[in-house]
Amino acid sequence: MNLASQSVDAGAGQLLFANFNQDNTSLAVGSKSGYKFFSLSSVDKLEQIYECTDTEDVCIVERLFSSSLVAIVSLKAPRKLKVCHFKKGTEICNYSYSNTTLAVKLNRQRLIVCLEESLYIHNIRDMKVLHTIRETPPNPSGLCSLSINGENCYLAYPGSASIGEVQVFDTVNLRAANMIPAHDSPLAALAFDASGTKLATASEKGTVIRVFSIPEGQKLFEFRRGVKRCVSICSLAFSMDSIFLSASSNTETVHIFKLETIKEKPPEEPTSWTGYFGRVIMASTSYLPSQVTEMFNQGRAFATVRLPFCGHKNICALATIQKISRLLVGAADGYLYIYNFDPQEGGECTLMKQHKLDGSMEPSSEILESSSHDRQVGAQTYSATVTKTYPPPSPTRHAYADDLGAVGGASEEDEMGNLRLDEDNENPPMILQTE
């Protein structure tokens, strides 16, 4: 959630940026005075992990999972990206680009820098520019999404400024994977699931949300957020198990959809007049306009959240905190809202707690005691315990890659080699091990 391009209410204070990390275990906040990281391990307390005041006007701050690797962009140098080891307070490398940096995405393989009309793909192991996607359709909001999965390492970005085409790019093999005609209107939001095999999309119209298989591009699900009014979708987010999808907008409602395929029952012969009438109604849908038929087939929200505000830009996440499912909403009003979420029953979610994003304590912020209706689930997050450190990096070595269009450089190659990504305890970053 980048707020640098819009005016922010006084209640948000100095907030310029907020985002969850890849597995929703921490929250990054950028402000006019620097940046902070908060742990999301507790509902009752927003524990500050780290605070930096050396860099002012931080409009982008992205953390790699729970490691110490952080990517930073400041309003004072909007074309410059700095990659740092925040626990040591050292800069690993920096790059400068031809235009303002609008978004930065990271996983354990790649770092993506999004400009208005180009995308830069860096190898996160040595920060070298591997590929540049040039002359993309104008993308002033920096809309893009990078899968956090190392094997299905796909990048999605708008393929058109006038209609909702999605370009899917394979960042490992550095080639286009697919073009998905997702919507009639321009895209407003994109999100991969944790496995990198599903992509959720929403258009500027905001009434329909679709989920596609990746890389095939087959439509798997279609959900209707509303009918009466068009809205601006702010955020899409899957749960870590890919069963649920949350969607927030500039309205007061957050919708949570369940990705399930309803098994069709075998047709039964009607035994009453109402049965015959129902069968006639179902048969008549084949003669209705396609738009009306689609509305009959679209899924509805499994659960909803009523936010205490309307009109603020926000981000949402479905997280597991202390083995219980929660919906998190970080908003431009300067607060993090935590709601209960019942993955079995759904329904209306209740506000449990709200925290100020500047980390300050506020009395009477507790809304609801932990309920006996909370259902424990298995932890959905990646393990991210980091203990090992490495020697501080040597001074930055600058180089100009004329064919790739980025001025900058990584630390000396032998120093970058110290970032052993095949060890779980390396800091930063780490490679996920699966059993």
Swiss-Prot record:
A motif (L/FRRG motif) lies at residues 223-226. Keywords: Autophagy, Lipid-binding, Membrane, Repeat, WD repeat. GO terms for cellular component: cytosol; phagophore assembly site membrane. It is found in: Preautophagosomal structure membrane. GO terms for biological process: autophagosome assembly; autophagy of mitochondrion; cellular response to starvation; glycophagy; nucleophagy; pexophagy; protein localization to phagophore assembly site. SUPFAM superfamilies: WD40 repeat-like. Coiled coil: none annotated. WD repeats lie at residues 182-222, 228-267, 311-349. The keyword Zinc does not apply. Pfam families: PROPPIN (PF21032). GO terms for molecular function: phosphatidylinositol-3,5-bisphosphate binding; phosphatidylinositol-3-phosphate binding; protein-macromolecule adaptor activity. InterPro entries: PROPPIN, WD40/YVTN_repeat-like_dom_sf, WD40_repeat_dom_sf, WD40_rpt. Its main location: membrane. Residues 386-435 are annotated as: Disordered. The L/FRRG motif is required for recruitment to PtdIns3P. Belongs to the WD repeat PROPPIN family. Component of the autophagy machinery that controls the major intracellular degradation process by which cytoplasmic materials are packaged into autophagosomes and delivered to lysosomes for degradation. Involved in an early step of the formation of preautophagosomal structures. This is WD repeat domain phosphoinositide-interacting protein 2. It comes from Xenopus laevis (African clawed frog).
